[in-house]
Amino acid sequence: VQTRAHDRSDFVTRWPALLARIATAAEAGAKLIVVPEGTVPAYVIGSDPVDPQQIEAAAADVIAVAARTGATIVYGRARAAERGLANSAYVVTPSGIAGYADKCFLWHFDRRWFSAGDALEPVDTPAGRLGVFICADGRIPTIASTLVEKGAEVLVVPTAWVSSGRDPRALENLQADLMIAVRARENGVPLVAANKAGVEARSVAYCGKSQILAADGSVVALAGQDEETTLTGTVAIGPPLVRLGAEPPPVQRLAGDPLPAVLRVAIAAHADPALRASALVADAELVLDPHERPSSSDVALVDDEAMLDPRALVAPRLDGVRLFVWRCSIDAAWAVPFARTRAAELRAYVVAFDTPQRRAFAVDPDGVVICGTFGAFELAAFTFERARTETWRVAPATDVRDALVRVGKITSRAVAP
């Protein structure tokens, strides 16, 4: 259910209509209904205390709908926790509240009124075993993979994907536009994400784009950016299409001196001495091709198995790798999404050599493809900037390195025997 954003002050008047949308979806036969993050009472909480009676009254309404219709409903709400409020997603079945998930990776102003979650556990429901995570948790690859490792059959994402509004006609969000499909495909399970549309508190713009994805990452249903709507779709529930090993596949870290602060790098899709000679045209100080192994401890070589495993690049990146070189032979439609996702979630450069397509391309730490070869254009170049790999902050007070380390501790507990 993609809802129209509301201010906290408007919750009481908006809630009957929101509840009616949930009930209508359930009465139409939906077995699993997902409602956005921060629906009750809102995402932008502010400094005023939350009324627990208001929160519990809304919960009772949702419980009644689930009991009457037989649906499983996942919705975003504030939860009173030991350390203050938690940004939670509650899972409600016909039998009542089955469980909840707290947001682990707080984003930007979340920290002002929420405390971070510290557990990752699937929730059993009549609709399947659900791996629930919230919004920015989707930027940390090991959150979804831990839930699937613990038996989740569907990934469920109540979210509040925001946009800067750079182009009001095409609102952007890296998760909605890129990462969330990779999360489904790399874990091999369906994924359902519900976002808001519109503006909250005159200062938070949502990009819509709620979506239902199949286990291979393909789109079953996708909402637009502006409308309040209910998406419907059918996905297959069963064992994951992907089976991750007990341990992440190895990544080959190279030896040598660190890369300089600024380095011009040329990339070629195939080894050719003549192309290497042409590197002078690009002012390149380093030329990479599928067989070149640069002598630097900042660089690691990655094969398909490691690139597709959401866990494999995390430890090397935390240990100081800044440039991943990938010899790629996967489906061409997924090469760029995986390279972009890994670069953005780990704040690193990725150079990919797509052997079947005879193409090389590079991605920067923001997940942007910054150069690539094609056709007769056989040598492309980019500038490696070490400082960009040292900046882990992706929003105010939102540090990816801190989150990776913190979630690593949570996942270690979660998978411990």
Annotate the PLM regions.
Residues 8-97, 161-189, 266, 270-301, ...:
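Cys-nucleophile CN-hydrolase/nitrilase-fold catalytic domain and related Cys-dependent amidase chemistry
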Residues 1-5, 256-272:
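Short beta-strand segments enriched in small/hydrophobic residues
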Residues 41, 47, 90, 101-107, ...:
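Short beta->alpha transition motifs characteristic of CBS
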Residues 80-154, 158-159, 163-178, 236-256, ...:
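Active-site catalytic loop in hydrolytic enzyme cores
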Residues 113-114, 122, 183, 190-263, ...:
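C-terminal beta-strand edge segments of enzyme domains
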Residues 55-74, 139-228, 286, 309-378:
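CN hydrolase (nitrilase-like) catalytic-core segments centered on the catalytic cysteine
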Residues 2-4, 36, 102, 195, ...:
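Residue-level recognition of beta-strand->loop/alpha-helix junctions
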Residues 3-6, 78-80, 103-104, 135, ...:
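Active-site beta-loop-alpha junctions enriched in small/polar residues
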